[in-house]
Amino acid sequence: MSVDRVWTFAESDYQYGVGPLRLRIERIDRAHPIRSDNEDWYPVEGVQVSATGSELSRRRVLVRGSRLPG
């Protein structure tokens, strides 16, 4: 996984927030999935990034496993 890449997650693919989330992922905790909606969701840590590329804030969210990189 490239630490420089920004991933965009639809509102339905992460918990919790409103609207799409642009995140530079720093860590995916694949050892501790949480089962919800008949899918595995994973704790993810990273930096939220604006549409213009500015860093906004650190975030910890659950992301639908099927939407995560590698």
State the predicted function of each range.
Residues 38-45:
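Short aromatic-glycine-enriched beta-strand elements
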Residues 29-36, 51-53:
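Short, conserved beta-turn/loop elements at beta-strand boundaries and strand-helix junctions
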Residues 45-70:
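Intrinsically disordered, low-complexity, charged/polar segments
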Residues 1-26:
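Short coil-to-beta transition motif at edge beta-strands of beta-rich domains
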